Amino acid sequence: RLVGSEMCIRDRDSTYDEYMFVCTDIHFATAGQNFEFQVNVDGQSGYNETVTTTIFEVHHKEDDSGTDGPSYLASNDQANGTAAIQLFGDSENDADASISGIVHLFGPASTTYVKHFYTRFTGMRDNARTGEVYTAGYFNVTGAIDEIKFRVSSGNFDGVIQMYGIA
């Protein structure tokens, strides 16, 4: 079980065509934060590779007083941006609150093509509502990706992040 403000995974092996990161029971120390990720190309630092993304969400309040979605989150997508990519936003930090989801990253070892990804996360959001967030895009780089960082926009988190290689 990981506890901290960020988790970095380094892999210099090109064994797999796809990597799947399974994030389970991610719990935030502070409410209202975003769970995010970014990558580094081999030999680079800063976790600020150029990325183009799209993101949408759905949610439903516990007391059935409101639903929303699917809603496109224009303020959270990027067009050749370098910021961290939002996986889940406005998290709750109640004792029973957490988020879980999966990140799929394709062809990270390629030195010819851009690197596509898609994600799906679900969990408890602020104001007692459940949410589901979908993000997709590509890293506009042709160098091999060898590092990925998961982090919270502010504060710490704990949870389990597992990496699987898919041939």
Residue ranges and their predicted role:
Residues S5-E6, R10-A167:
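Surface-exposed molecular-recognition determinants
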